[in-house]
Every structure is written in structure tokens, then in C-alpha cells.
């Protein structure tokens, strides 16, 4: 079963998203902090990552930049911020998609 890592500090988002993905035979793991997410990704075994933009420690843009230095895992930015420039920045930093 493909594994997806969600890095989002909203602990209410993970369970319903996990239930949704499970219908498509995808396993979701949530990290609430970027440092936790990077540690999990370093262990390997994930097929894709979903990043929030507004995170503690570092924002999702910096997290994407950091992740791209060591991994080519598909990255989707998922955020409530719908500004066009945010989308441009996310994609320029290496995100594969940006969903406002």
C-alpha cells in the first residue's frame, strides 16, 4: 500500500484525510511539526508528501526547499492560502502541485 506523509500542524485534519485516502488503498501518516516530518522522511518508505504552508518551526516553502535538497519524492502543497504568488513560489521551490 503506498504511503503518504502529511506534514500539517492541524491535528484535526489527519484522521478524516486518512479515512479518505484509505478508500483508495493509500496509507497516511501525519507529522505535526516539520522536524518530525523530515525525520520520518529520512527513514524512508514514503511515496509522496503533502505539506501545509503555515507551519511552526519553518514554513512549508522552506520545508519544501529543504526536502528537495535530499529527495525527489512527489510533493503537494496543501493550504488555505490561495494567493497566486504563493502557488508560484511553491512550484518554483520544487513542489509538484499546489492545492489552495
Place the predicted regions along the sequence by residue.
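N-terminal/domain-start alpha-helical segments
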Residues: 1-100
